[in-house]
Amino acid sequence: MALALSVAPTSSSLSSLLSRTPNPSPNFRTTHLNFGSQRRIYTINPLLRSFKCLQSSSRDVNASPFSISAIASSSSSSQTTELVPYKLQRLVKEFKSLTEPIDRLKWVLHYASLLPQMPESSKTESNRVMGCTARVWLDAELGQDGKMRFCADSDSDVSKGMCSCLIQVLDEASPVEVMELKTEDLAELNVGLLGGERSRVNTWYNVLVSMQKKTRRLVAEREGKVPSFEPFPSLVLTAHGIEAKGSFAQAQAKYLFPEESRVEELVNVLKEKKIGVVAHFYMDPEVQGVLTAAQKHWPHISISDSLVMADSAVTMAKAGCQFITVLGVDFMSENVRAILDQAGFEKVGVYRMSDETIGCSLADAASAPAYLNYLEAASRSPPSLHVVYINTSLETKAFAHELVPTITCTSSNVVQTILQAFAQMPELTVWYGPDSYMGANIVKLFQQMTLMTNEEIANIHPKHSLDSIKSLLPRLHYFQEGTCIVHHLFGHEVVERIKYMYCDAFLTAHLEVPGEMFSLAMEAKKREMGVVGSTQNILDFIKQKVQEAVDRNVDDHLQFVLGTESGMVTSIVAVIRSLLGSSANSKLKVEVVFPVSSDSMTKTSSDSSNSIKVGDVALPVVPGVAGGEGCSIHGGCASCPYMKMNSLSSLLKVCHKLPDLENVYGGFIAERFKRQTPQGKLIADVGCEPILHMRHFQANKELPDKLVHQVLSCESKR
């Protein structure tokens, strides 16, 4: 339902922002705010359709923490007619009039002294502002006159002063005015403070985002809207245990503590038969839980993204492993087989986990006739370079490379690959595929770079400038008919719920997600509250933020929204538990949130007496399907059905049967490509070359001469 906000025509963008805001969770109850000794309770009545200033009786500013405007100006704030932009302009003018950093710091500290004291009862976990180096609390109320009031506090005087400045601007503003202010509007307040400048910048931004989140909720409550959905399922980790919230989280959590007998069985057979295991992050949680536990007893187990899997297999072969089991989709086992052969380990057996095709929607898209047509168009436009996502078959890479010189990429190196290609060949045309969302996100990223300075662009790539970025954009193409079915699920509904409930949390997003989720995470990234990239980038980001919080050694609640396949949680939990375990006295809470479609939610019991324990995980009993995930791929859970074909039972069966002299599991073997390309070459040989080009780029930070020659040779033959 739309919020009952009536805005001027110039506020159409804000109107659309608030036009379909979901209702808050039942867990978020209306807070009655304390004003001195008097408790003021507002009834929940529908707001007027316009938040025009309604004159009300003067407040006792000495009795309320929501009174910064009255203290900071010579006249009563309830009588002011100043607009938010004018207040901000005046604040910026004050700030910029001070040229010395020490004077600006004193100015911020002066504002800190103006901030009314916040009641201790308001310094709650729900009022903490995430992403600030210091502890910051923010509370808000929506007055009966339709105006917002804020109060804040911090254990840092500098952060407190920043809060005071923002409250000076937004106190007694209408909800629309609060929502219209953007983080970019605060840019001129960012320069020249002493020490920790980047973290200080983030305080401005994160407090503003929290103000806007509270404003949304208060407006919804004032309109009398009944909450219509639960929070997304999540896992909450502390130094002392794990709590699973929601049925999907329950299903994930119950495998974090596998049966010792299963772990022992796997370790014994791996050791006995010298078997290595390479598995993708997106594995089923059951098999990941066992593999994670088994890693402590057998070193030749690797859980990683697709790029590292083949490298790990080579390392295992060098260490004496005679077999490699691959837990992933078919193009991953193909790559492992081909790279092992290239490294001279033809005798090492490679096994998949099924005798059926373990497909991938992206790999399938690259094998379709439409992709061949796309490449044929590229071949007619030399000099062209085909940048193909590593998540494609070896056959696709081989056929493509014969049509257009090709280099593979990953979600973590695709941007640098493209920038380097244009730097080495300025007249180049780049054709990326097959992931349409990633392609669109790359283009959007480069478009955002056109708003940067030359210095900022050079920090991303030293051989590029504003002119070169503008020049390359018309010559950057991407395939528009390929998507990952998992990341496709992060669409409009999920994004709207994240905006409403988790806009102040840390947001993570794989580069394959749709544009709305990409933009949301990119905005968070600007204030160091988000990451967009590969699965490994996401894992590293979470690890960094948790480590920083552990080092601060204060009570805190970090919340991460997992914008990729839910199978990542096993590796994430392992990293977080390791960091929290290093500080047994830590009061830190880390929450990992799984964005799930509302169609796939199952209500859980709120009665703690009905919970059960698995290891140190408290699992609520789920009414109905207690043993199920409570959601499915069709309902919108970020879970890949292809990856889930790699079960623990399959892994154990294959391992026990090896060396399979009777060929019982012949259908599980990752076969070598004996077929030839149209030019009569082996698919394995030609398909590996784009991968080797990428490896050269990663090692040397430039495209190999051989690839550059291939691209320019096509131009000379034109």
From Swiss-Prot:
Cofactor names from the entry are:
[4Fe-4S] cluster
Its BP terms in the Gene Ontology are:
aerobic respiration; iron-sulfur cluster assembly; NAD biosynthetic process; positive regulation of sulfur metabolic process
Compositionally biased intervals (Low complexity)? 1-22
One Pfam entry for this protein is: SufE
Work out whether the entry's keyword set contains GTP-binding: no
Q: What is its EC number?
A: 2.5.1.72
MF (Gene Ontology): 4 iron, 4 sulfur cluster binding; enzyme activator activity; metal ion binding; protein homodimerization activity; quinolinate synthetase A activity
Write out the catalytic residues in the record: 132
Q: In which tissues is it expressed?
A: Expressed in roots, leaves, stems and flowers.
Per UniProt, iminosuccinate binds at 280, 306, 389-391, 411, 510-512, 535
User: Start and end of the transit peptide?
Assistant: 1-70
Indicate where this protein is primarily found: plastid
Q: What happens when the gene is disrupted?
A: Embryonic lethality when homozygous.
Q: Where is this region: Disordered?
A: 1-29
Its pathway is: Cofactor biosynthesis; NAD(+) biosynthesis; quinolinate from iminoaspartate: step 1/1
Any idea where this protein resides? Plastid, Chloroplast
Q: Which reaction does it catalyse?
A: iminosuccinate + dihydroxyacetone phosphate = quinolinate + phosphate + 2 H2O + H(+)
Outline what the protein does.
Catalyzes the condensation of iminoaspartate with dihydroxyacetone phosphate to form quinolinate. Can complement nadA-deficient E.coli mutant. Essential for the de novo synthesis of NAD. Also participates in cysteine desulfurization mediated by NFS2. Can activate the cysteine desulfurase activity of NFS2 in vitro.
Assembly and partners are described as: Homodimer. Interacts in vitro with NFS2, CpNIFS3 and AO. Part of a Cys defulfurase complex.
By sequence similarity, the record places it as follows:
Belongs to the quinolinate synthase family. Type 1 subfamily.
Q: What is this protein called?
A: Quinolinate synthase, chloroplastic
Q: Which gene encodes it?
A: QS
